[in-house]
C-alpha cells in the first residue's frame, strides 16, 4: 500500500510513548490558562516577560490595524514592505546595536533560509549537538558538510575546525540560550574559536532576546560582547516579546544578499503590518521595562533554591527554562499528568526532541508568576516524583 509508513510510524510513536497532539487553549496566554473548561497554572509558556496578553500590546495591534490595515498584500519586494516594516527594522538596529536587519515570518524559516542560502557542497557547517531542530534539519538537507560538536565543548569545536583548515567557507552555529536545556552558550569562547579558524559565527538567540543582557539585548550582550561582534545574529519575536515572527541581522552586504538571493524571503508574503507595529511596541517595552526582567530573575532564583531544598533533579540552567530531568518517556508523561491533575500545566519533553533517556519536564517561568505559585509547584513536583518512585 502506498505511503503505508504513515500508519506504521504513528503506531510506533504511540507504542514508545512518544505520540504528540495539540491541545486547544481557551482564551488568552496568561499565568492561568483554560483547557477543556479547567484552569491551570501555566508553567509551559515562552512568554517570559508576560507581554503576550498585555493590554498595551493588545491596543498596539488594534492601532496598527487602524493605521496600516491587516495584511501586507504581497511579498517584501513587491507591495508587502510597509513603512512600519522599515521603521521597526531601524528600531531593532538601534536597540540591539545591529548594522542591518531583515524580517522573517518565523525563526524556523529564517534558520532554514540562511543555511540554504549561504552554504554549498564545498562548505562546512558546524553546529552544537543540541541546537534547535530548525538548524539541525536545515543542515541535514544542505549540500554542505555538517559536523556537530559536543554541547558547549570548545575543545571539540576547535578540533573540528582545525581539521578543516583548507575549507574556505565555514559557519559555526549555536543557540544563545538552549531551548530544551536552558543553559547558555559560551559566546566569547565561540567567537575566539571562529576568529582563530577564520569561520563565521551565527547565534540563534530566540530564548535570550528580551530576557538577558542590558536592556534585554540578549545573550551576546549579557556576556560582555556586542551583537554586532557575531557575523549573524537572529532572534524571534514570539518568546519574550510575546508576538511572533523573527529577524536576521548582519552586515549590510549580507542583508542585501538575503534580499536578492533568499527564495524563502523573496517569495513569502510580508508579515502583517499591524503585527509589525505591535512588535515595535513590544520591543520598546522589553527594552525599557527592566522590572519585568528583575521580577523574572528573582523567581528563577527562588525556583532553583526550593528545588535544591526538595532535591528535585534540575538540569544546570540560570534562565527561565528550568528542566526537571526524569529519564524515561513514560515516566515524564506520568509526572506531567500528575501535575495536570493537580492544576499545573507542564509539558513532558521526549525524544526525538531530546536524547533518549533524557525525557524531562520543561518548566518555564515568566514575570507573571508569583512566589506562592512556585512554592506549590515545587512541592507537587516532589510529590509526583516520590509517588512514581523515580
Language-model segment annotations:
Residues 270-289, 308-309:
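Structural motif of enzymes handling amino- and sulfur-group chemistry
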Residues 147, 151-203:
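Active-site phosphate-binding strand-loop segment of PLP-dependent enzymes
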Residues 215, 221-257:
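Active-site PLP attachment segment
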Residues 295-301, 310-342, 353, 358, ...:
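Conserved PLP-binding catalytic core of the aspartate aminotransferase-like
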Residues 1-94, 192-198, 329, 359, ...:
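N-terminal glycine-rich, Lys/His-bearing helix-loop that initiates the first secondary-structure elements
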